[in-house]
Regions:
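PDZ domains, with a preference for the canonical peptide-binding region formed by the helix
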Residues: 16, 223-251
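A short, glycine/Asx- and small/polar-enriched loop/turn
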Residues: 195-196
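Extracellular and select intracellular beta-sandwich modules with Ser/Thr-enriched
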Residues: 260-262
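Alpha-helix capping/termination and helix-coil
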Residues: 168-172, 208, 228, 243-246
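Serine-dependent protease modules
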Residues: 1-192, 206, 236, 255-258, ...
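Conserved PDZ fold ligand-binding element
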Residues: 2, 8-9, 210-233
Length: 270
């Protein structure tokens, strides 16, 4: 519960394409709710309950102050087991993870608290009961056939939750994503043997960071700040860890085979 007005924050992948919901509270009441707004890029959504005498909103900690080693509790409905609580520690604060569906989450809190289907959209809290994150996904292990890797889960940090939820509650949409953007549409570029070699620029948005730096359609982005960008996913991972107005060096290969390095001041997504 985000506030006493009936706003509830959860994961975008939990609400999916639905706009109408049923919400069951701890006192046993089940009330109707509607979608307020969603932010797929950060995997967050807000729904609103219609009713009176609603619970007060949760208290949110400053996720930047969360320390590795702190004990934390994951609260949710794993495997349909309502109001379950699991414990663990904060394993890392500030991890960038790829959900595998085009969504790259930055600054996540990695935790050893077990995260199972049904935990998504719940709460990760500290021992003061303050929300430090929303459990969102667990790591998978290819050696386990894609099964969950025990003790490695990720939560969207409370500071991101507050920044995004405040905008959704206020306007139903995101007006300040806080995410860095180059201002291009792109696709994977492959070499003669099909190997990934970079990110092909399909289009450049007028007046965007890329346009102002001189990046053109047909260029292939190969590095950001010296880190290779073999494909779109790698580029997205790097951008997710950066912020608007950050200055970066972008290495490109032009259609004629020559190379250039551009100083780019990143723009803002959304």
């Amino acid at each position: 519960v985000y506030d006493a007005s009936g706003d509830i924050v959860t994961n975008d992948h939990v609400v999916g394409t639905d706009t109408q919901f049923k919400v069951t509270f701890a006192d046993g009441r089940t009330l109707d709710a509607t979608l307020v707004g969603a932010d797929p890029a950060d995997d967050l959504a807000v729904i609103k309950v219609a009713g009176t005498n609603l619970p007060a909103g949760a208290m949110f900690a400053d996720s930047k102050q969360v320390k590795v080693g702190e004990i934390c509790l994951a609260i949710g409905n794993p495997l349909g087991l309502a109001s379950s609580v699991t414990d663990g520690i904060v394993s890392f604060n500030g991890r960038t993870v790829n959900e595998g569906n085009g969504v790259v989450l930055s600054s996540t809190i990695q935790t050893s608290a077990p995260i199972n289907p049904g935990n998504s959209g719940g709460a990760l809290v500290d021992l003061r009961g303050e929300v430090i994150g929303i459990p969102t996904l667990a790591a998978t292990d290819p050696q386990l056939g894609g099964g969950a890797a025990g003790g490695i889960g990720f939560a969207i940090p409370s500071n991101t939750i507050k920044r995004i939820a405040d905008q959704l509650v206020r306007t139903g949409q995101i007006t300040n994503s806080g995410r860095a953007a180059l201002g291009i549409t792109a696709a994977n570029a492959n070499g003669p043997q099909g190997q990934p070699v970079g990110v092909l620029v399909h289009s450049v948005i007028a007046a965007s960071a890329a346009a102002q730096a001189g990046i053109s359609v047909g260029d292939v982005i190969t590095q950001i700040n010296g880190t290779p960008t073999p494909d779109v996913s790698a580029l997205a991972d790097l951008l997710a860890a950066l912020y608007p107005n950050d200055q970066v060096k972008v290495a490109v290969t032009h259609p004629n085979g020559t190379t250039s390095s551009y100083d780019v001041t990143l723009g803002k997504l959304g």
